[in-house]
Curated annotation (Swiss-Prot):
<dbReference type="GO" id="GO:0016887">
    <property type="term" value="F:ATP hydrolysis activity"/>
</dbReference>
<dbReference type="GO" id="GO:0046933">
    <property type="term" value="F:proton-transporting ATP synthase activity, rotational mechanism"/>
</dbReference>
<dbReference type="GO" id="GO:0005524">
    <property type="term" value="F:ATP binding"/>
</dbReference>
<protein>
    <recommendedName>
        <fullName>ATP synthase subunit beta, chloroplastic</fullName>
        <ecNumber>7.1.2.2</ecNumber>
    </recommendedName>
</protein>
<dbReference type="InterPro" id="IPR050053">
    <property type="entry name" value="ATPase_alpha/beta_chains"/>
</dbReference>
<dbReference type="InterPro" id="IPR027417">
    <property type="entry name" value="P-loop_NTPase"/>
</dbReference>
<keyword id="KW-0067">ATP-binding</keyword>
<dbReference type="InterPro" id="IPR055190">
    <property type="entry name" value="ATP-synt_VA_C"/>
</dbReference>
<dbReference type="InterPro" id="IPR003593">
    <property type="entry name" value="AAA+_ATPase"/>
</dbReference>
<dbReference type="InterPro" id="IPR000194">
    <property type="entry name" value="ATPase_F1/V1/A1_a/bsu_nucl-bd"/>
</dbReference>
<keyword id="KW-0934">Plastid</keyword>
<dbReference type="GO" id="GO:0009535">
    <property type="term" value="C:chloroplast thylakoid membrane"/>
</dbReference>
<keyword id="KW-0375">Hydrogen ion transport</keyword>
<dbReference type="InterPro" id="IPR004100">
    <property type="entry name" value="ATPase_F1/V1/A1_a/bsu_N"/>
</dbReference>
<keyword id="KW-0793">Thylakoid</keyword>
<keyword id="KW-0547">Nucleotide-binding</keyword>
<dbReference type="InterPro" id="IPR036121">
    <property type="entry name" value="ATPase_F1/V1/A1_a/bsu_N_sf"/>
</dbReference>
């Protein structure tokens, strides 16, 4: 059943007309609520607790029904802190799932899981709202066009190209650059693609959310003078929020993106940082609801929860949602159930490597681990495919030779292998790139490199035309012409020192 967005008059509150219950038990963020016989709320209905605590402070807590316990009781998970709640307090059944504002009114604003603005810029037009729980589009509505989504990041466009309307995962452990890469993608896509983006901050650092907001204002993605001209809506449920909020904030962001796709018929970008926190919050809620844990302590409903979110992120005949999701990998273990379940839904995986980050190569994208279903000659063309395969072969050969080099040194290799190693080291450095969003840290201006320029650069390295250039000339540059110019500068500098 697909529930369409509803339109209602502004400020109409129907809470007073609904069923009333009372709090029977409070266990952290979980509430048990008793209702009169025959007046039980449905699963996923929103319940509202209003009143005052012992100090007289106003309380307004929204919960979501998760279980019907019998004996006219339901168990609900709170979307905000339950401080100050007491047994016996009145609970209102709203009679419907959580609904959030959608449409143009959301652009340039920051929302919480309930769709309430948290940026102190005044109220949002809530005449058009949509429930966060909806079924995925029917099979017949889906669209299956295959086209590449250019990002301007060399390593991504060459080795693991993104699909327009596809799902992309950024995999990496702690501190290897997932959020910076997401911020660069938002920046590049807003400039080159000009579409609408929705950013879902799921259980990540509040500081990063604030940095992102400030950078969006600086780069013009959020237009402070005319908010309606902004290109992005932000939804945040950060690390300090209760698990209920972190579990549902992804659905809030997705609901806003679906409206742009289905009603406005736009191509939308949905960024989720971090999808692992969605699973983690689901695991916390599952334990609070008393379910038996499954593998590695995760919830038994892990695949179902992930599927219900991911199946809604898709392209229909009206428009597309291209989704880029950061995936934290616990202890760098890609076989952990959370990242492993996410892998199954993705069209492209960009794996970030701690080894490359340690070498100072950013973006630290692993050229051998990263994959894409789009890297086929019939989709990207023979030239792109051949270049990508040769880059991977050269990198793979270098990886195989590293043990020999570590023990015996470069001199023990054959002439051919030494040439392969020299080219692989140039390729490794040329896969790095200065980012626009990292200008403040690095001091070097960001670079957007088109796909044709990227392919030309790697072809020149592989052909041997640039064998005479020093490998440091290829580090943190844009296209290949910058590398040759940098090599000339290095030569001039070394001559001056002599």
């Amino acid at each position: 059943m697909r529930i369409n967005p509803t339109t209602s008059g502004p400020g109409v509150s129907t809470l007073e007309k609904k069923n009333l219950g009372r709090i029977a038990q409070i266990i952290g963020p979980v509430l048990d609520v008793a209702f009169p016989p025959g007046k039980m709320p449905n699963i996923y209905n929103a319940l509202v607790v209003k009143g005052r605590d012992t100090v007289g402070q106003q309380i307004n807590v929204t919960c979501e029904v998760q279980q019907l316990l019998g004996n006219n009781r339901v168990r609900a998970v709170a979307m905000s802190a339950t401080d100050g709640l007491m047994r016996g307090m009145e609970v209102i059944d709203t009679g419907a799932p959580l609904s959030v504002p959608v449409g143009g009114a959301t652009l340039g604003r920051i929302f919480n899981v309930l769709g309430e603005p948290v940026d102190n810029l005044g109220p949002v037009d809530t005449r058009t709202t949509s429930p966060i729980h909806r079924s995925a589009p029917a099979f017949i509505q889906l669209d299956t066009k295959l086209s590449i989504f250019e990002t301007g990041i060399k390593v991504v466009d060459l080795l693991a190209p993104y699909r327009r309307g596809g799902k992309i995962g950024l995999f990496g452990g702690a501190g290897v650059g997932k959020t910076v890469l997401i911020m660069e993608l938002i920046n590049n896509i807003a400039k080159a693609h000009g579409g609408v983006s929705v950013f879902g901050g799921v259980g990540e650092r509040t500081r990063e959310g604030n940095d992102l907001y400030m950078e969006m204002k600086e780069s013009g993605v959020i237009n402070e003078q005319n908010i309606a001209e902004s290109k992005v809506a932000l939804v945040h449920g950060q690390m300090n929020e209760p698990p209920g909020a972190r579990m549902r904030v992804g659905l809030t962001a997705l609901t806003m993106a679906e409206y742009f796709r289905d009603v406005n018929e736009q191509d939308v970008l949905l960024f989720i940082d971090n999808i692992f926190r969605f699973v983690q919050a689901g695991s916390e809620v599952s334990a609070l609801l008393g379910r038996m844990p499954s593998a590695v302590g995760y919830q038994p409903t892990l695949s179902t929860e992930m599927g219900s979110l991911q199946e809604r992120i898709t392209s229909t005949k009206e428009g597309s949602i291209t989704s880029i999701q950061a995936v934290y990998v616990p202890a760098d273990d890609l076989t952990d159930p959370a990242p492993a379940t996410t892998f199954a839904h993705l069209d492209a995986t960009t794996v970030l490597s701690r080894g490359l980050a340690a070498k100072g190569i950013y973006p630290a994208v692993d050229p051998l681990d990263s994959t894409s279903t789009m890297l086929q000659p019939r989709i990207v063309g023979e030239e792109h495919y051949e270049t990508a395969q040769r880059v991977k072969q050269t990198s793979q050969r270098y990886k195989e030779l590293q043990d020999i080099i570590a023990i015996l040194g470069l001199d023990e290799l054959s002439e051919e292998d030494r040439l392969t190693v020299a080219r692989a080291r140039k390729i490794e450095r040329f896969l790095s790139q200065p980012f626009f969003v990292a200008e403040v840290f690095t001091g070097s201006p960001g670079k957007y490199v088109g796909l044709t320029e990227t392919i030309r650069g790697f072809q020149l390295i592989l052909s041997g035309e640039l064998d005479g250039l020093p490998e440091q000339a290829f580090y943190l540059v844009g296209n290949i012409d910058e590398a040759t110019a940098k090599a000339m500068n290095l030569e001039v500098e070394s001559n001056l020192k002599k």
